[in-house]
């Protein structure tokens, strides 16, 4: 362990809390994946986990991207110990491992009810029925009922743009006019749209074992667009997402998974500059921040300190053991804290990574304040993002 990292992390976390959230700072083709650090043997990083988690918990962290569809008091106890709040997100997936959408939503609601106030609901809708005449009306009625019962956000998923088609075979994009009444209803109710649109660039590239997503596409070939050249290109899907943002300036949109602009933070920055109603979460894409140049990522997170929400994409599924979930959740939170809040050097998936050691107020905003701003209702704070006209 480096001498820099030996300073007590609890002191660091208290400094972050004291600093508060206010910080005033200025705000041609797919890239090929390149490792930005030397490969090294993987080593377990568990000896400092309790200290890391104590520092993490001091911020009352918010994980804005979780899929929890099973109850267990040990998970609830963990959330209490970590002072953790989560957004439990439902997904409308024809290939779902979560069960039918109704079953999935019921399980999420049961988890939230048992969470002792530590979880809130992000609902979704069935996009495969979008061609039906009353689709928009029924969907608006559905999400309005869910809002009345406590849901605070709505998700659209990557099947919009990559799988859902019209009866005549046209791929449906996220800016399709059929969705406009739904987006207007979300904005009118002061809720947030969580948009998982498109996929990492590796989805359209030849297989590369060095890619962070190699195993996912190996196990889920239906989403590996390199093998489906007749499907829309990523550029087309992201352009439709950008049009959605432009057409709905009063709609708060959180782009899941770094907004599918994971390989270069400059691409995210361009959207932030163009669309004040847009933020991103880090769910399942922290590794992409680790492999980009350290100072570039650090400067990006400092400059756009109010626009990046902490998220993980952690799961707790009906067939998963609580022991496995506890291990995964704690390891993920400890590792992400180490990367964002310290300058420690550590091994992750065979790469040597140095922590970003972000300023204390920026760390607090990423782990807590930004979720409060962009997803009102995720805790009891009245703060929310103000979208300028």
Predicted regions and their residues:
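N-terminal Sec-pathway targeting helices
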Residues: 2-14
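Active-site gating/metal-coordination segments in enzymes
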Residues: 44, 52-54, 102-224, 276-279, ...
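Hydrophobic alpha-helical membrane-insertion segments, chiefly the h-region
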Residues: 12-26
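Active-site gating loops and adjacent loop-to-helix segments of metal-dependent hydrolytic enzymes
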Residues: 34-39, 58, 82-85, 118, ...
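Hydrophobic faces of well-ordered beta-strands that scaffold small-molecule active sites
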Residues: 62-66, 86-89, 119-123, 154-156, ...
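Acidic-and-aromatic substrate-binding clefts and catalytic sites of carbohydrate-active enzymes
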Residues: 65-73, 93-104, 128-137, 164, ...
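An N-terminally biased module of ancient metal coordination in phosphate/nucleic-acid-related enzymes
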Residues: 23-118, 137-138
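H/E-rich (His + Asp/Glu) clusters that bind or coordinate divalent metals
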Residues: 39, 229, 234-243, 247-389
